[in-house]
Structure formats: structure tokens, C-alpha cells
Amino acid sequence: TTIIGGALVRVLGHLGADVVRQNHLGDWGTQFGMLTQYLDESPDAGWRAAAGDISMLNACYRAATARFGVDQAFADRARRRVVSLQAGDPATLATWRDLVAVSQRAFQALYDRLGVLLTPADADGESGYNGVLAEVVDALVAAGIAVESSGAVCVFFDDVAGPGREPVPLIVRKSDGGFGYAATDLATIRHRVSTLGADRILYVVDARQAMHFRMVFATARRAGWLPERVEAAHVPFGTVLGADGRPFRTRDGDTVSLGGLLDAAVDRARTVVGGKNPDLAEADLARVAHAVGIGAVKYAELSTSRTRDYPFDVDRMVSLSGNTGVYLQYANARVHSILERLPAGTERTVDTGLPLHPAERALALHLDEFGAVLAEVAASAEPHRLCGYLFALARLFTDFYGTCHVLRAQTAGQRANRAALCRLTGNTLSTGLGLLGVQAPHPL
């Protein structure tokens, strides 16, 4: 979600949109209720003594989840803890704030490592809307949009039903008095439209939430909080898979952390880069391995149609052939090494009135499509279109450079045209990789 959202933010901003980044940190749903209750009941967990170590909290969360699934009394206490949190219980709030602080530090370290644009100022979690949730629910009830059902307040839909045709509601207030995610999502829509003035809202969230967002958007439109002039879209994404075709996990069944995936990619990139450039100084090798490894993971995510699942194959990700970030980084470095050999004052535009070699024409036509591709990415929220374009550009440039002499061109006009194509290709590759959030170091 962070990698895809980061690329969309960059592309939209590049095209002139006023983009507001919002990161949904500060969640306090059932998961936080489970964890808070578990920590209160497990004083020996030692998470505070571990200086807020996120791995310690992850272990506690796994234990809380396991207990929640088998201990009904604990599950009930955890649910009541969520209600206490939403009601402003001081002790629960204090623990929650500590947990959020630990999470934010861990996330920010990953964001910085990934080179995404999110900062602590972009955090906009559920807690920020707690004070208006009752008002949101009351407004839905008063408008006849939400009704009470089995003690909960729900919104029903004529076109949404379960496998047995039973109605599937959107629960805005649970039977225990707590507010569900739907109430928060509705409050955020109202705020983003009425206060932030949004004309397009993109939710980069797991594909499994498709039905939830369909119902939330429909409810917001019925309530008048999401007028027709405003687009709200769920931008779903698939799952990273292991070699067995299942969601990527460690041997003991735990989900693999993003940090662990990045470590593996950087280590493998170091081997590949070091093998190709054995004379690189240690500091340069570390710098390039970081750029290549992180870029490889980001590009693998972005180059796949975002709704598809894809395997985490670090060897393929850092391959120097095929549609990989490393291939494009090396293509970009190669183009810039050529540019450094061009004389000063080289033309930057192509004179289409001169005869063009087929490889020149193909490259020029492809370069001309860059703006249209960016517009497609912005409209569809599909970064893989840009990846495909850049991969094709790199291949076309390879064909061009292999068949068309630049410095030894037959005429001055031909030499100027080919130099301009080199410069335009370099600028486009650098810009495109930058919009994907992939570093383009040169030399490599």
C-alpha cells in the first residue's frame, strides 16, 4: 500500500494535482483492544522494558490474537476495551498512545528506508474522528439511512447480500456501543470533501476490503457527504506470495516483515553489483546495493498489475535482464554515461524533417507517448503502466544505440538528432524512475 500510494502521489503531483497524503495510523479497532487487554493481563510480557521494540509487540499481538480465538471471556474483555478506548478511558488511552508511538517509529523508519514521502504529519487515524462518530451515526439514523438491527445500527442495501441471499449490512455502531470502521470511514469522507475540498479520494487498501468500500461510498452518497462531482475509488492490491504460491511466510508460519524482505533484496543486490563491478569502493558498493535492492522490491510491486498476486523472488527482482528495476537502473546509467561524452550545447529536440532510421523513429515515437502514459497512470491508478512504458523505452534505446552511430553519425543534422534522442531518453528514464520512487544512481 505504501509503495503503490507513494508512486501515485508522485505521478499526480507531477501532473499538477494538489495531493494530500493521509496515512491511516492510529487505528483503535478490535486489534488494539486485543493487544491492550493482553498487555494489561500479561505484566511479564516486557514490551516496555524492550524500549518499544516493535518485534516484541508483534510477538504480543500474535499471542493476543491466538488467545482471542480460543478464549471467549478474553475476547469479550478485548471488545469492551475498544469501547472504553472510544469513550476516552484515561488508562486505556495512555496504553494506546504508547503503542501508537512505537508503531509510528517503526513505520517511519521503513518509510525513510523506502524513500516514500510519508511523514508523521501525514498520519490521520481513526482517533482523530472519534469526537464526531456519534454525530455521524445520529445523522444517518435521522435521515432514515441507518436503522437499528439486533442492537446495532446498520445500513442495508438492496443489491448487497450474502451467499444465502441474507442481507449484508454496513455496521456503523456495534451492539456493544462501539463504533465500527464504517463510521470512521464515513466521517473521513465528510471531512475530506467538506473541509479539505477533495475532488478525488483514492483508498490504497487490500483487495479484500472491496465490499466494505462499496458500501461506505454508497452510504456517503445517500447521506450527501459524497456528491457526484467527487470521485471516491478503492485502489486494491494483491498479495506477495512465497515459492509455494501461498502468502509469504517464514518457516514457523509468521508473516515476513517488510524490513526482512528489504534486507534480503539489498544483500542479493550487493552480490550482483559487486560481481559486475568488482573494483567498486566499499562505500560506493553499499550505496549502490541499497539503491538497487530497495528499487528492486519497489519495482517488483509496481510493475505487476496491482490486483494480481505475485511471488517474492529476490533473484528475479535483482536480475539484470527482463522487466526489473535493476535493468532500468543500468539502462539509465548507460544512457547518462553516453550523455557525458556528448559535446556541450548538444541539441535537445529532434528535427523530424530529417530522414530517420527506423530505430530512431521508433524511439522518438515512444518518447512522445510519455505524457499520455502518465495521464493513463493518473486516471487508472495503475503504476504498472509506467513500468511497462519505461521497460519498452530501455529496449528501444538499446536497439537504437546498437544500430545508429551517435558521435560518428554521417551528417551534423543526424548527429544532433541522435544526441537529442539520447538526452530525451536519459531525462525520461530518470523522471520515470523518480516518479516510481526508484533511485536512479549513475554511475552504477
Where are these regions (language model features)?
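Non-catalytic interaction-recognition regions
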Residues: T1-L444
